[in-house]
Amino acid sequence: MQKENLLIELGTEELPPKALKSLRDSLKSGIESGLKNAELSFDSIEAYATPRRLAVLVKQVETEQQDKEVEKRGPAINVAFDDTGKPTKAAEGWARSNGITVEQADRLKTDKGEWLLHKATVKGQALSVLVQGILEAAIKALPIPKPMRWGDSTAQFIRPVHTLTVMLGSELIDAEILETKSARFIQGHRFHSPQGFELDHVDNYLFKLREAKVIANFEERIETIQSEVSRLASELGGQVIQDDELVEEVAALVEWPVALTASFDQGFLAVPKEPLIVTMKDDQRYFPVEDGKGNLLPQFIFITNIESRDPQQIIKGNEKVVRPRLADAQFFFESDKKVTLESRVAALDSVLFQKQLGSIGDKARRISVLAGKIANQLTADVKASERAGLLCKADLVSDMVSEFPETQGVMGKHYALNDGESPVVAEAIEQHYWPRFSGDELPLTKEACAVALADKLDTLVGIFGIGQVPKGDRDPFALRRAALGLLRTLVERKLSLDLHELLAASVEGFGDKLSNNTVATDVFDFLLGRFRPWYQDQGITVDVIQSVLARSPSKPTDFDQRVKAVQSFKSMDSAASLAAANKRVGNILAKSDEEISGNVDEALLQEESETTLYRLVKQTEGAVKPLIAAGKYSDALTHLSELKEPVDAFFEHVMVNADDDKVRINRLNLLFRLRQLFLEIADISLLQ
């Protein structure tokens, strides 16, 4: 079977940078699926994307489908012929549709009857014919939320399409998509090669593009940008602030990345670095540079899409653009410093948190009280925690945060230090937002933890308290993120706090504002539910998580210890047998109508196996209860694993449902004692 390399390229106007990778990957997936569905094999498939093109290159794809032998079954013989043996209309119609006569048909005999049969060879179609449908389906499946039209065209796409190239080796394939016909013309770089070029062979595609100053490979552009930016930063004696999203976005904006260094007035460094970084990265897509101590340098690196004969002109242009933005940040900082954070708290009363829950000012006062209570439990500085809680939202009404919302918290820290607040208070103001996203840093001090926990609890309790529970993808108050941040802080900072107590304290702070009487229970259940995805991400199996959830531990640190202990227990040789035994015991007890107390009468023990089990259960109780009380669940489960053999022997030799009611109830009490031992840690009957 002949094979050749296939190229499909759409030449467009500038594609949205944040959508470029998903468009590329989706086009690749669509073409790949189309070829596989057409049963056309190939060696490999690569996708390319630049601001002005989407392309797929398929290596060594079959140029034609293989012929297929097919069998088409017709009507049953008793339907195909009448009583005289003459073909019926049904038989003749079927034969005609297959291009044969009834007499030319074969017979298919099975144990269920006999049918007319036509064996035919279906000739495979050429890829040059099939590619139109494959491409149409792939384009239709692209993730384009808002397609647009252009010129007089009725076609719709994410951006106007100007060229289409579909080639098989050196052959141009006749195809049309989005009212654009396939041609050999390929767009070059907008400035370096505006004339484009005619492609003579698929194998020359990447080479010819590079000649036209286009790096088609998205990942190669990323590597080029990272390498060049790091090199220039090193020449400045610094290092670039890592930001993979920024690199990816810039790579989606250029076809021929060229890195240049520019500078700004050193006087701007009197402004905290965070708003300067936000200005350079988010507004201008520049790469700020820090020294080895984390101090911002008065230089930045930027990527241009052109190799200029006069790069100084480009550098000066970018310096001119960034200067007023940095000046704005400087003005906001100097202006904001004239007003203390404490005096801004009153202004928070005019900023709405939620209609039924009041203002941000109300929230800050609740956070302050709750943070003090939490700090007391953590033996932290109560006054500092209360102070930080009161001031933690005050920077929201500053000019800087109004202009650069990403700097909330960190600007609060700078303003607090400027006001003479203690470093403990200032750090807590910044860190109370932590963690801000998955994998982010956690609050570092106990005081910061107290304020962070209070803030998240206030949001969770407040929103649940008015019945606005997250549903599906809707979570406008980011309650899932708040819940996970709260749990991570408690677990990873090893803060042994009880959720029931925390929730009760938070509910108290709302007075009569909450309409949901079960809010504390609802939030508790919601928090425990967030453990599941968190532990799954860590490789903990669902059955282990469920076994601990069944016990509903109210301290997240305790929950964590149990999960890790059960995960370790599950790998023991005895785990499967004991899990099955616990399940069996649970079923037996569930079916019993007797009142089971766990009190075992030794005089009623008749079989050696039940006597042995009772003795060992008592011994194990004495050994594991102190371990459980100390949170040493792994050690406790190791002791419990030694019950495997006596439990197996009990079920092998003892009839639980004895005829004698007293003996039966006594045995149920023994099983109850056994089950309770395991349930002190987790419901291991749920282990798979």
From Swiss-Prot:
Protein name as catalogued: Glycine--tRNA ligase beta subunit
Catalytic activity: tRNA(Gly) + glycine + ATP = glycyl-tRNA(Gly) + AMP + diphosphate
Gene symbol of the encoding locus: glyS
Predominant localisation class: cytoplasm
Pfam families xrefs: DALR_1 (PF05746), tRNA_synt_2f (PF02092)
Family under the similarity heading: Belongs to the class-II aminoacyl-tRNA synthetase family.
Quaternary structure annotation from Swiss-Prot or TrEMBL: Tetramer of two alpha and two beta subunits.
GO molecular function: arginine-tRNA ligase activity; ATP binding; glycine-tRNA ligase activity
Subcellular location per the Swiss-Prot or TrEMBL entry: Cytoplasm
InterPro entries: DALR_anticod-bd (IPR008909), Gly-tRNA-synth_bsu (IPR015944), Gly-tRNA-synth_heterodimer (IPR006194)
GO BP, one annotated term: glycyl-tRNA aminoacylation
Organism: Idiomarina loihiensis (strain ATCC BAA-735 / DSM 15497 / L2-TR)
Keywords: Aminoacyl-tRNA synthetase, ATP-binding, Cytoplasm, Ligase, Nucleotide-binding, Protein biosynthesis
